[in-house]
Amino acid sequence: MTSIWIELAKAVPSVVTAVTAVVGVCIAARGLNKWRAETIGKRKAELAEDVLADFYQARDIIKAARSPGSFGYEGATRRKADWESEDDTRTLNAYFATIERLNNNAEFFAQLHARRYRFIAHFGHDAAKPYDDLFRIRGEVISAVQMLIMTYRDRDQGSLPADRRDWERIMWERRNPADPIPGNLDRIVEAVENTCRPAIQEAAK
C-alpha cells in the first residue's frame, strides 16, 4: 500500500501541471474569443459610423444638386450646340447645373458604393437596400435632366410639354408634398440609421 501512495504522490504534480495547462488554455481561448468579438464589434461600429455619415452627406448632395437656383457659371461644362441662342444656352446650362453638381461629387459616390460590399459582409444583403434606393434616385435625377436637354428643341410637340413638366419635377426640388424625393431620401437615411445605430451603441457600452 505504501508504494501505491508513493506512486500517487509522484503523479500528483504531473496531474496538477496538466490541469493547470488545460485551465490556462481555456482562459487564453476565452480571452482570445473576447478580444476577437470586441475587435469585430469595433470594426463593425466604425463601418456603421462611416456608412451612416455617407448617407447623411449623400442626402445633402442630392438636395443641393436639385436646387432650382444656379449661378451664371454653372452648367458651362455642357457642350453647346451650334443652333443655341443665348437664351437657349442659359436655359440648358441651368438644367445641366444639376448634373454638374452631382458630377462634382462623383468620387464621393464611388467611395460610398465601394463601401457597400463591406456593409453587406457585416450586415447582410437586405440591409444594403438603401444603397440601391439612393442610386436609383440619383439616376432618376440625371435621366430627367438628360431628357429635358435632349427634347429641348421639340419641347412644344406632342406629349412633350407634359413629359417635360414631370422631368422638371424630378430635376428640381419643389417645397410641397407633390415632390416625393425629399421624403424618399429621408426614409432611406432612416433605414440606414435603424441598421447602423445598434452597432454603434453596442460598441460604446
Give residue spans per PLM region:
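Membrane-embedded hydrophobic alpha-helical segments
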Residues: M1-E38
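Short hydrophobic/aromatic-rich motifs at helix boundaries and adjacent loops
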Residues: S3-L8, E86-T91, R164
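Alpha-helix boundary/capping and short turn/kink residues
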Residues: V25, G41-A45, A121, H125-A128
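Transmembrane helix-loop junctions and nearby membrane-interface residues
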Residues: V25-L32, I61-P68, M147-T151
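Short amphipathic alpha-helical/adjacent loop interface patches that line ligand
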Residues: L32, F55, V189
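Amphipathic, membrane-active segments
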Residues: R36-A76
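Hydrophobic alpha-helical transmembrane segments and immediately flanking/interface helices
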Residues: G75-L92
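An amphipathic alpha-helical interaction surface
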Residues: W83-D87, F96-K205
